[in-house]
């Protein structure tokens, strides 16, 4: 009986495990694969109607299909699934997590470390540009199907797209926890529809399956030497969203993402592209919109509805990714602090950042109004995508060689292969900068300027403050000689340096002539890892005479809740009772000058960013009625 019971229990646990695995797989399909899953809407259309000069004939179609297939296999299956997904930072992925790893890998090489940081900032900047382009091009391409269903309403495509997109941004502050549960099933339905349409098309012209032979891709370059590299600028559209596999790894883990790719997403994409190719072999005129023309007439409107839902889900994933990237960048010190609102009581990762949301919305609206069609936007899309892919390869190269210590004989050939393919895709998109691709470059340039100015400005600010800092041991010695009046309670002074006296403490002594019975010099340390366990959260050191030094460590995915963290600090004589604890903050006002370190115009820009950044009070969740803020002026 006991044996039977244990078998029943293990069987039940096995079913639960299988159910959880399927649930994770479906959820991953809904979040991770929305972008790459909607690429069939516009990729082949752009290849054959984008002015590349590719003929819609037997060799041209098979050559392009072979290029798309082997690009998916090399870039997504081999590079991202088999290699990049292994470069996790304690389970987290994405540009900032990878930059943190690369910083750690190059710690012994200062110049190389600086280069890795620059690459990471450029990659993050391009991602924000991509976060504007993806919603615009995806929703436009879906709504364009309405023009095929009803004659004479093409002029409604832009207004309908704008309504859908603006509504999407307006609901962000309320979160997507409830409707988010539908994303997975909807996207699974979408991929099944892609596969079914593809099978329908292939059955009409099975010879299209010859494109599985890579010789057709090689032959295309031989026959079309003039446009061979240029056409990669359109082929790369089939790879848009590949970066999401890595960026969203922290939500689902490597295995569910990999399984979803090989079991459902890759087969559905390949079938659909080949189905569209089969249609083009039969009817070259279908190149104007091969995706929708592949569907039977009765299925067109339902397909437009399903495509619109899929593109909205893809857009939601990119917007959420921008919120997550911003939080990581804030924690790592690359972006000014902003108001972060949690939209779910259960999921810590579901956040809303108003400044990012409204900036993205304005960018998306301007893109839709300015470009008016998905085809016109395709040029801008490729630059952002290929730039991000190339930078990811550069960062992971440092990690593989310097952190993982892979043997160069094994790592270098693989990395050279990645860099060669990424470099070709990027080079193919460089000429598009003059055709609309300037947008992500300009947007990325502006964002890089802001992030680099903030990072450098904060470094100079700390240096200037440190120049006149009083060493803590000297201050404590003077206190012993001339003891000031002490009052009951704990005073917590936030400071970037733990070995010097904070300006706020000196100002408090100067104006109030008193000290609290307990004085805590608190330094918050941002780690290059996503989370710091509670037992590693704090370091405490007693200096005597009621002075303590406390270091709090937070990862870039942690919530920097200082009062909650201080409750974990256990040391005799240290008391953080809320109503007996007062937090003293220093508020710096920056004055741009001609001092070395930063040009005056960048100094003014930094001063503007600092003035509008969220202060320590909200960022560290300090109690409003227990905070005293003291100001100081600093020249940079």
Swiss-Prot record:
Query: Which ranges of the sequence are coiled-coil?
Result: none
Q: How does it sit in the membrane?
A: Multi-pass membrane protein
GO molecular function annotation: potassium ion transmembrane transporter activity; symporter activity
From the record, give the transmembrane residue ranges.
Answer: 22-42, 64-84, 115-135, 150-170, 182-202, 220-240, 261-281, 293-313, 351-371, 383-403, 408-428, 433-453
Source domain of life is: Bacteria
Instruction: Spell out the subcellular localization from the entry.
Output: Cell inner membrane
Q: Which reaction does it catalyse?
A: K(+)(in) + H(+)(in) = K(+)(out) + H(+)(out)
Give the main location: membrane
**What are the GO cellular component annotations?**
plasma membrane
The UniProt entry, under InterPro entries, shows:
K+_transporter, K_trans_C, K_trans_N, Kup
Q: Which UniProt keywords apply?
A: Cell inner membrane, Cell membrane, Ion transport, Membrane, Potassium, Potassium transport, Symport, Transmembrane, Transmembrane helix, Transport
Name any one Pfam family assigned in the record.
Answer: K_trans_C
State the family named in the UniProt similarity comment for this chain: Belongs to the HAK/KUP transporter (TC 2.A.72) family.
The function of this protein is: Transport of potassium into the cell. Likely operates as a K(+):H(+) symporter.
The protein here is known as Probable potassium transport system protein Kup
Traced from the root, the source organism's taxonomic lineage reads: Bacteria, Pseudomonadati, Pseudomonadota, Gammaproteobacteria, Pseudomonadales
State the encoding gene.
kup
């Amino acid at each position: 009986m006991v044996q039977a019971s244990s078998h029943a229990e293990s069987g039940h646990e096995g079913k639960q495990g299988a159910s959880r695995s399927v649930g994770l797989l479906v959820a991953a399909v809904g979040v991770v694969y929305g972008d790459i899953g909607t690429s069939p809407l516009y990729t082949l259309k752009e290849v054959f109607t984008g002015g590349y000069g590719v003929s819609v004939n037997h060799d041209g179609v098979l050559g392009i299909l072979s290029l798309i297939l082997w690009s998916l296999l090399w870039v997504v299956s081999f590079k991202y699934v088999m290699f990049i997904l292994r470069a996790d930072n304690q389970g987290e992925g994405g540009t900032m997590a990878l930059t943190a790893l690369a910083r750690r890998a190059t710690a012994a090489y200062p110049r190389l470390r600086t280069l890795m940081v620059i690459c990471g900032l450029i990659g993050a900047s391009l991602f924000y540009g991509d976060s504007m382009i993806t919603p615009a091009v995806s929703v436009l391409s879906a709504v364009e199907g309405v023009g095929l269903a009803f004659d004479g309403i093409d002029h409604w495509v832009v207004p309908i797209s704008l309504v859908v997109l603006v509504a999407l941004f307006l609901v962000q502050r309320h979160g997507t926890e409830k409707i988010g549960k539908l994303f997975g099933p909807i996207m699974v339905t979408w991929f099944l529809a892609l596969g079914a349409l593809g099978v329908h098309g292939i059955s009409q012209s099975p010879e299209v399956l010859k494109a599985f032979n890579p010789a057709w891709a090689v032959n295309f370059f031989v026959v079309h030497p003039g446009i061979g590299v240029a056409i990669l600028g359109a082929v790369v559209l089939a790879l848009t969203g590949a970066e999401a596999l890595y960026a969203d790894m922290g939500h689902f883990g490597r295995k569910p993402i990999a399984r979803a790719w090989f079991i459902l997403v890759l087969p559905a994409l390949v079938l659909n592209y080949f189905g569209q190719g089969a249609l083009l072999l039969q009817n070259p005129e279908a190149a104007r919109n091969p995706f929708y023309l592949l569907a039977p007439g009765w299925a067109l409107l339902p397909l437009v509805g399903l495509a619109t839902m899929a593109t909205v889900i893809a857009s939601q994933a990119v917007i959420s990714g921008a919120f997550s990237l911003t939080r990581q960048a804030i924690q790592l010190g690359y972006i000014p602090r902003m108001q972060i609102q949690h939209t779910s009581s259960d999921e810590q990762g579901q956040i809303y950042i108003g400044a990012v949301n409204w900036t993205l919305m304005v960018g998306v609206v301007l893109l839709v109004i300015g470009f008016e069609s998905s085809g016109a936007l395709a040029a801008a899309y490729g630059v952002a995508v290929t730039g991000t892919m190339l930078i990811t390869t550069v960062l992971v190269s440092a990690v593989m060689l310097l952190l993982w210590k892979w043997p160069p004989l094994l790592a270098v050939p693989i990395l050279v292969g990645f860099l060669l393919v990424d470099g070709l895709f990027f080079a193919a998109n460089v000429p598009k900068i003059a055709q609309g691709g300037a947008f992500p470059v300009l947007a990325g340039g502006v964002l890089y300027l802001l992030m680099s100015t903030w990072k450098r400005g904060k470094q100079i600010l700390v240096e200037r403050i440190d120049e006149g800092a009083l060493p803590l041991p000297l201050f404590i010695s003077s206190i012993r000689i001339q003891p000031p009046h002490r009052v009951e309670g704990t005073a917590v002074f936030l400071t970037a340096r733990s070995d010097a006296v904070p300006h706020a403490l000196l100002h408090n002594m100067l104006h109030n002539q008193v000290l609290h019975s307990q004085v805590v010099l608190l330094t918050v340390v941002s780690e290059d890892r996503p989370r710091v366990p509670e037992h590693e959260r704090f370091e405490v050191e007693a200096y005597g005479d009621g002075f303590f030094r406390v270091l709090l460590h937070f990862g870039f995915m942690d919530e920097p809740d200082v009062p909650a963290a201080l409750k974990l600090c256990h040391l005799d004589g240290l008391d953080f009772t809320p109503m007996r604890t007062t937090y003293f903050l220093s508020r710096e006002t920056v004055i741009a000058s001609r001092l070395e370190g930063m040009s005056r115009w960048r100094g003014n820009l930094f001063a503007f960013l600092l003035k509008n950044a969220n202060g320590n009070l909200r960022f560290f969740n300090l109690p409003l009625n227990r905070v005293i803020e003291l100001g100081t002026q600093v020249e940079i």
